[in-house]
């Protein structure tokens, strides 16, 4: 009985220690830890359905300081038919952010994907210019003063660094970039205006070099681009080149860069810590957004790329980031 009593006591002690570890994690906030180093936010992607899922929302409220709407601000959601706007989903996210003290990154105003067919069918230059200006003006006016940064144009480059073929580039040439950014600046001068893309994870890669080359040219022409967003959807073990890539993007002359859609196949602690340290080490890197909370809701769920597992439990990478900060 004495042995059993000691065993029970030992189990109780271990349980209390474990509870202490859990409580320590719950007391930490990845956003607070990150911003204590002078950065602006550590955020995540979400939307109404996820914010109404209690386990997901609790983590968002506690751990993240910024929200990016995963789909509710894209063109097919906000203006599915010409001149008829729907802001229900976007309103929900922005209102939640205001009530809970979160910054918002608007995502996205001009993108070739999730684009209504009525826009894709436009072939007249004046018509597309008018449609583009009206869309940007209407969406940005609704949230004026409430959005920290906007992804004004998204994924406009090919892998070799040339401009992607889209209705915007076909009809307007690269001038659609000027039209979009100048319109955005006129509507909300306080918002940071970004160009955002994926596969900008190595300084030597063609798309990264193309982004830097074009942004330098556009800035020299007076186009008001404040920042470059690098989505940073990484494969396992691909984190070591991120710091160099961020440095290259920052060299374009923009005032800031950000990691905007981070997820990493396998979610290894080393990969996540490498990316966080890369942003910390690059002065112009203002923040990191992970592309979701739980693997359950990830667009790459098969590769378990996020900081929380499918049961909303923190992974080793989460704790490694907290420890590194």
Swiss-Prot record:
One of its GO terms (molecular function) is endo-1,4-beta-xylanase activity. SMART domains: Glyco_10. GO terms for biological process: xylan catabolic process. It comes from the Eukaryota. GO terms for cellular component: extracellular region. Induction: Expressed in presence of xylan and repressed by glucose. It catalyses: Endohydrolysis of (1->4)-beta-D-xylosidic linkages in xylans. Disulfide bonds join 279-285. PROSITE patterns: GH10_2 (PS51760). Endo-1,4-beta-xylanase involved in the hydrolysis of xylan, a major structural heterogeneous polysaccharide found in plant biomass representing the second most abundant polysaccharide in the biosphere, after cellulose. This is Endo-1,4-beta-xylanase C. It comes from Aspergillus fumigatus (strain ATCC MYA-4609 / CBS 101355 / FGSC A1100 / Af293). The lineage of its organism: Eukaryota, Fungi, Dikarya, Ascomycota, Pezizomycotina. The gene is xlnC.
């Amino acid at each position: 009985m004495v042995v059993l009593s000691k065993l029970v006591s030992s189990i109780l002690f271990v349980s209390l220690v474990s509870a202490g570890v859990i409580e320590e994690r719950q007391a930490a906030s990845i956003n607070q830890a990150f911003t204590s180093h002078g950065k602006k936010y550590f955020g995540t992607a979400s939307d109404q359905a996820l914010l109404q899922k209690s386990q997901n929302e609790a983590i968002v409220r506690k751990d993240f300081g910024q929200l990016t709407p995963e789909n509710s601000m894209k063109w097919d959601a906000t203006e599915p038919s010409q001149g008829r706007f729907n802001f229900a989903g976007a309103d929900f996210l922005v209102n939640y952010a205001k009530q809970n003290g979160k910054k918002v990154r608007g995502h996205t105003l001009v993108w070739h994907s999730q684009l209504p067919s009525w826009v894709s069918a436009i072939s007249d230059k004046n018509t597309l210019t008018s449609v583009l200006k009206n869309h940007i003006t209407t969406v940005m006016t609704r949230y004026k003063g409430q959005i920290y940064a906007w992804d004004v144009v998204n994924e406009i480059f090919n892998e070799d660094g040339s401009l992607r073929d889209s209705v915007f580039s076909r009809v307007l040439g690269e001038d659609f970039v000027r039209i979009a950014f100048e319109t955005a600046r006129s509507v909300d001068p306080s918002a940071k205006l970004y160009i955002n893309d994926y596969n900008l994870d190595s300084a030597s890669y063609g798309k990264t070099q193309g982004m830097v080359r074009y942004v330098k040219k556009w800035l020299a022409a007076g186009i008001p681009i404040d920042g470059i967003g690098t989505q940073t959807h990484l494969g396992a073990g691909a984190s070591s080149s991120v710091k160099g890539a961020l440095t290259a993007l920052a060299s374009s002359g923009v005032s800031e860069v950000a990691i905007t859609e981070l997820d990493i196949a396998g979610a290894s602690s080393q990969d996540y810590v490498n990316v966080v340290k890369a942003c910390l080490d690059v002065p112009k890197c203002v923040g990191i957004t992970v592309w979701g909370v739980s693997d359950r809701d990830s667009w790459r769920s098969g590769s378990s790329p996020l900081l929380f597992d499918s049961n909303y439990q923190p992974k080793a990478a989460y704790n490694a980031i907290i420890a590194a900060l």
